[in-house]
Every structure is written in structure tokens, then in C-alpha cells.
Amino acid sequence: MQVKLFYTLALWAPILVSAQLSGSVGPLVDFKTKAKNKTCDITDYGAVADGKTDVGPAILDAWGNCSTGGLIYVPPGTYSLATDLELKHGESTAFQLDGVLARGHEGSYQLILVRNCHDCEFFSGNSQGAVQGYGYEYLQDGNYGERLFRFQDVSDFSVHGFAAIDSPAYYLVFDTVSNGEIYNLLVRGIADLGMTDAFDIWGQNVWIHDIEVTNGDECVTVKSPASDFLIENIYCNLSGGTAIGSLGTGTNISNIHYRNLYMNQADACYLKTHNGDGIVKNIVWENVIVHGGPYPLAVNEAWGKDVGSTGVQVQNLTFRNWYGENTANSRPAIRIECDEDVPCYDITLDNVNLWTEDGDYVEWSCANAYGSGACLQEAKDTGDLATYTTAVTVTATPSYSATHMPGDFTTNPPSTAPFTIPPMPTSFYPGATPISTLLSLSGAGGL
């Protein structure tokens, strides 16, 4: 198990963590202090936990009174949310979701938008809070609805402790965020439809850890621009997997560290571009277990629609301590195919052991990629890299043992009925203890 170095300076202080982070993450003031300053219980503003009455106006009124220096409290119970929420301009605020917000209408873009918020925390105090999207009502017919969450222009923040269930589209989007901690979260939904990304994140200095995802598209995905991310203890349990991209013009991604990734029928690395421009550099994927997935380790610079321009420069990627297998040997277990106009370089595969669930050989495919390991060519001078394409057939079975998680799904969840909200998981990677324990508060702020 990879040793993690972290220090808690005080109950109310942000956390300092090692690896790729560039500074402290999390709220500047703890939720208990905010609750002592002022608490706005939504039932005092007319909210009724009957699963029918729209709770939106009560939440907006509570936010208006407590969004500066206070805590908004959603007590246990099921509340119908028939209003798209825009929670904006929060300053030193906390939102404690101990009940269930159930989508009660056909909305437009996202059910809950948190924007322009500094020193804020969105969390469940009893670790039983959830947002129920009833996405099956759309998805069973091949249609899509609104996203569940968007956090936009948020800094010095944390999001933790609740479940996002059955979204009609994307689950959680983190748009231009900084100095954040995202952890102890569960995403559970239909696993056979795209456009249902669980976590799409771009920004600076973000720690994502202890996450479980079941969905039909990407699990934890880094978008551009992004820098100084630590992503660890990730359990993609029937999902598209962890990815970077897709990328376009002006790409700027650097200093991203993935570690302790567990993939059940999911891909651990899919870096995808098709032309575009800019740079991706200094990325590490280490301590990875893959059980199934079409492309467990893939860099594909001819993916999807051609967005024009000269190509994205990809450099200094490290893949270390990988174990597992893909679903079919008709697809390369290792695929590193870079743009012929801007070849990749400084790519390192160190102790990568990937086999297949189907057959007695695997393929490796490399194109215009330089470094060490698999089918990569060595570069003597990165200033003048020739184009090439090569494929290697491997028949020698690697010697390794890759643990299975007891919670692995073997069949897709049903797509024609509401999801039961499961309890929060307590394990996200074999042998790794979650970094932060689940909260078990009673009442607002645990006071």
C-alpha cells in the first residue's frame, strides 16, 4: 500500500497533503464553527419531508440567510426538489445534507448549482444524505435530463459524505475549482449508457479520494485546464473508468497523480485527443488493479471528432505497478498511439502486468510514442522524433496476483426502476483504509 503523508493542522484548518498537490485544500473554517455562528434549518422555512412538497423555495430562503458565515441544514427525511437550485455567492458557508433530495420535475441544465463560493462545504453529517435523480425515467428510453450537481468557481472547499443516485445525465461537474477536497462519495446509476460521467473536474490543487462509482460513462475524469491533482483510492465498479479528456485547443494539464485505482469492468487510463493543441505533462498512474475493461491502458490521439489545430503534446507519463486484464484480446491491452505531428515522449511503463480474460495472448500497440516499456521506442533526441507504428503480440502470461473487491458487480443495475439508496461504502481499494472516516453527526453541525 502506498504510504500517504498528510497532516491535520487543526479541526478548522485546511489539510496539507503530499504528492502532486501544491498547497492546502479544504474549507478555512470548520462546519461546527459555522453552525455555532448561525444555523438555518430548512424546516423553519417551510420544508416538509413528505416527498411531495417542493423544498426548493425553503432551501433558497435558508441559503439567503445563512450563505455568509452559517450552515444550512437539511434534516433526515425525503424532500421533493422541483426547483433548480442556484446557490451562489457563498462566503464561509456549509450545506449539511442529512436527508434525501429527490428530483421532482423536468429541469433544464442542473438540479443543484453551487457557484462563486469561497470557504464552503457541501456534506452529509450523518453519511446518509443523498440526491435521488430518478434518471431511469429518461434513460430507459435513451433520453437524457439534467445533471445533478455543478460546482462552479468554488475555492477552499470540500464535498463529502453523500450519495448521488441515478442521474438523468452527468452526476458531479467541478468547473474551475481550486484548493478543494472531494471524498467519501458514492455514485450509483445505470451502467450501460454514455453521457453519464460521474466526476468531471478541472481547476487547480484538488484532492479526490475514497470514491465509488457505478455508471455508464467516465468515473473520475480530468478536463482542461487542470494542475496539481491527487486522485487516490478510486473504485470504478462497472464504469467507463478514469480518464483525461477529451481534449481540444488550448489544452493545459500538468502534475496529476493517480494512485490506488481499482477497476471492475472499467479502464484505468484513457487519455483521449484528436488534434487540438497545448500540453499534457507530468502524469502518474500507480498501484492499479484492473479486472476487465476494453482498453485498460490507453493513450489515443485519434479519438473522436477532429477538433483541428496541430496536436496536443503529451510528455512525461509514468505507469507503475499495474496488474489485471482486459475483457477481450481483440483490443490492445496496452495502447499508446500518439499524434504523428507531435509524438509523445518520456513515457515510462514500470512493472505493468496486463493480461486478458479472453484468450492466450494480448496485443500491445504503439505509435509515435517514445520511452521505456511495452512497445515504446527509445528516444535519443526528443527534438527530432520520427513517426512509427508497431504492434506486438505477447503470449507469455505475466506472473501476478490481483485482488478482487467483495463488492464487485457482475451485472448491470436495472434501468427501468428506481434505485434503492445504498449505504456509504467503507472500502475503495484493497488493503487501503479510507483516509477520512464517515461522519455520524446528530443534528446541525453536530452541536
From Swiss-Prot:
- InterPro entries cross-referenced by the UniProt entry: Glyco_hydro_28 (IPR000743), Pectin_lyas_fold (IPR012334), Pectin_lyase_fold/virulence (IPR011050), RHGA/B-epi-like_pectate_lyase (IPR024535)
Q: Which residues form the signal peptide?
A: 1-19
**SUPFAM superfamilies per UniProt:** Pectin lyase-like
As recorded in Swiss-Prot or TrEMBL, the protein's gene is named rhgC
Residue pairs linked by disulfide bridges in the UniProt entry: 40-66, 219-236, 338-344, 366-375
Task: Please give the function described in this protein's UniProt entry.
Answer: Pectinolytic enzymes consist of four classes of enzymes: pectine lyase, polygalacturonase, pectin methylesterase and rhamnogalacturonase. Hydrolyzes alpha-D-galacturonopyranosyl-(1,2)-alpha-L-rhamnopyranosyl linkages in the backbone of the hairy regions of pectins.
What Gene Ontology cellular component terms go with this record? extracellular region
Pfam families for the chain: Glyco_hydro_28 (PF00295), Pect-lyase_RHGA_epim (PF12708)
* GO MF terms held by the record: polygalacturonase activity; rhamnogalacturonan alpha-L-rhamnopyranosyl-(1->4)-alpha-D-galactopyranosyluronide lyase activity
Q: Name one GO biological process term.
A: polysaccharide catabolic process
Keyword tags: Carbohydrate metabolism, Cell wall biogenesis/degradation, Disulfide bond, Glycoprotein, Glycosidase, Hydrolase, Polysaccharide degradation, Secreted, Signal
User: What is the recorded name of this protein?
Assistant: Probable rhamnogalacturonase C
| Carbohydrate-modified residues | 37, 65, 237, 252, 316
Task: Indicate where this protein resides in the cell.
Answer: Secreted
What does the record give as EC number? Answer: 3.2.1.-
Active site annotation, chain numbering:
217 (proton donor), 291
Top-level division of the source organism's lineage? Eukaryota
The record's family statement is: Belongs to the glycosyl hydrolase 28 family.
